[in-house]
UniProtKB/Swiss-Prot annotation:
Superkingdom assignment: Bacteria
Protein name, as recorded: Argininosuccinate lyase
Swiss-Prot/TrEMBL GO biological process terms: arginine biosynthetic process via ornithine; L-arginine biosynthetic process
One of the Pfam families matching this protein, by short name: ASL_C2
Pathway where it operates: Amino-acid biosynthesis; L-arginine biosynthesis; L-arginine from L-ornithine and carbamoyl phosphate: step 3/3
EC class of the enzyme, as a word: lyase
EC number: 4.3.2.1
Originating organism: Corynebacterium diphtheriae (strain ATCC 700971 / NCTC 13129 / Biotype gravis)
Length: 477
């Protein structure tokens, strides 16, 4: 390897008489987390070389040499042959070193003209995030599909619906499962909306003030798959709201999975007995032979805190930074890289867990009326007979009190007991005191009636497919 400057492995050094101290370098180095940007450095460098050529700052022959060298460097990065050295300060310095080793300092040293690490890293980070969020979006659709699959497998299964963790009203299991799919689809919609702001290129902004070399930021933006170049070079190099927004969306995905995980943890307990976990997606105990632990769900719940922490930490880093670029912004990448890494572990595991759950429909049905979940149906039956809801609510509550004192269900009250509460409670009220009737009666849009849940499932599946197609569409041609 040749030596090419005062501070080898970095992009600065001429005004310094020596390199940084060991402790200073240890603090400054970032290749252990920014190396994910290396493939994007190659793509952006090719685009930059072309605009240098267009501006007559790079000859045709030098352009050809440089593009060939960048091709070789890109392949070496992809294969793992080229890696950062301990002396490389960051991905940018390492990649310049690699290019110069291939094409020599005369040609390789020209690439830096008109660009700064400030606009470079802001652009590469956006490029990496745009690809990474599409990968996450695709995996989220697979979890949504697993929920829809289970809904299809159990179209008529009835379970207890809860509010405040207390028995509320009977609902279809499919309705409950699809209720977990909906926020995940909104998460993908947030990703798509976020992508509009990610699709603005800071390249050409220089350190902060733009470039005097008559380069073409729009040409670079177009080649790299962006919608446009940024409108303000100071903002382009120093803003990381896109990173904070990314951290939020990733944390929200984890939160939505954590809510599902929490339910699965309870559902598989003997006390609930709703589901049995697949052996492939559970673990045992080192001392208790009978245990079958919901580790996937618990790790999802635990790692969600980690993603929330990444968001909180990034927001704290970004606050109160003056314009323009500050070195604090080096801290923007680690939490984002980590959040993506955690979701890449969690999403396939949760998808596997959900798709292999065995639901016990008889158990769900037996618990559906427990806790007097048909009380609302009784009250609404009275409303349909012309009774004001306030009176109907009181009467239904009185029926619950009698049934509770006897240890029976509402459907087991005698005709005399019903009439003693309100003479308008005739024997016909028994037609609504079944969980099947209660579920079927809730046929408004979004309700738990089978016909409505089937509509929901169809929309979930079509939306998931649409989002899948978006996620699979390459950012760059």
């Amino acid at each position: 390897m040749q030596k090419h400057g005062t501070n080898e492995g970095a992009l600065w050094g001429g005004r310094f008489s020596g390199g940084p101290s060991e402790a200073m370098f240890a603090l400054s180095v970032s290749t252990h987390f920014d190396w994910v940007l290396a493939p994007y450095d190659v793509l952006a460098s090719k685009a930059h070389a072309r605009v240098l050529n267009k501006a007559k700052l790079l000859s045709d022959s030098d352009l050809e040499t440089m593009l060939g060298g960048l091709d070789k460097l890109g392949k070496a990065v992809a294969s793992g042959e080229f890696k950062p050295l301990p002396t490389d300060e960051d991905v940018h310095g390492a990649m310049e070193r690699g290019l110069i080793d291939i094409v020599g300092p005369e040609v390789g040293g020209r690439l830096r003209a008109g660009r700064s690490r400030n606009d470079q890293v802001a652009t590469l980070f956006r490029m990496w995030v745009r690809d990474a969020v599409r990968s996450v979006a695709l995996q989220v659709t697979e979890l949504v599909d697993a929920l829809a699959y289970q809904a299809t497998q159990h179209p008529r299964a009835i379970m207890p619906g809860k509010t405040h963790s207390q028995a509320a009203q009977p609902v279809l299991l499919a309705h409950q499962l699809l209720a977990h799919a909906q926020p995940l689809l909104r998460d993908i919609d947030r990703i798509r909306d976020l992508d509009k702001r990610l699709a603005i290129s800071p390249y050409g902004s220089g350190a902060l003030a733009g470039s005097s070399l008559h380069l073409d930021p729009e040409a670079i933006a177009q080649e790299l798959g962006f919608d446009s170049a940024c409108d303000n070079s100071i903002d382009g190099t120093s803003s990381r709201d896109f990173a904070a927004e990314t951290a939020y969306v990733l944390a929200q995905i984890a939160i939505d999975m954590s809510r599902l995980a929490e339910e699965i943890i309870y559902w598989c307990t003997p006390e609930y007995g709703y589901v049995t976990l697949s052996d492939a997606w559970s673990t045992g105990s080192s001392i208790m032979p009978q245990k079958k632990n919901p580790d996937v769900a618990e790790l999802t719940r635990g790692k969600t805190g980690r993603l929330i922490g990444n968001l909180s930490g990034l927001l704290a880093t970004l606050k109160a930074q003056p314009l323009a670029y500050n070195r604090d912004l080096q801290e923007d990448k680690e939490p984002i890289v980590d959040s993506f890494a955690q979701l890449n572990l969690l999403l396939p595991a949760m998808t596997g867990l959900v798709s292999t759950l065995t639901f016990h429909e008889d158990r769900l049905l037996s618990l559906a009326p427990a806790g007097f979940t048909l009380a609302t149906d009784l009250a609404e039956w009275m409303v349909r007979q012309g009774v004001p809801f306030r009176e109907a609510h009181e009467a239904s509550g009185a029926c619950v009190r009698i049934a509770e004192s006897r240890g029976v269900g509402l459907d087991e009250l005698t005709d005399d007991e019903l009439a003693s509460v309100d003479v308008r409670l005739t024997p016909e009220v028994r037609t609504v005191l079944t969980v099947e009737g209660a579920v079927a009666s809730r046929a408004t849009r979004g309700g738990t009636a089978g016909v409505r849940v089937e509509e929901q499932r169809s929309r979930v599946e079509s939306t998931s497919q649409s989002f899948k197609e978006w996620a699979l569409t390459p950012v760059r041609k």
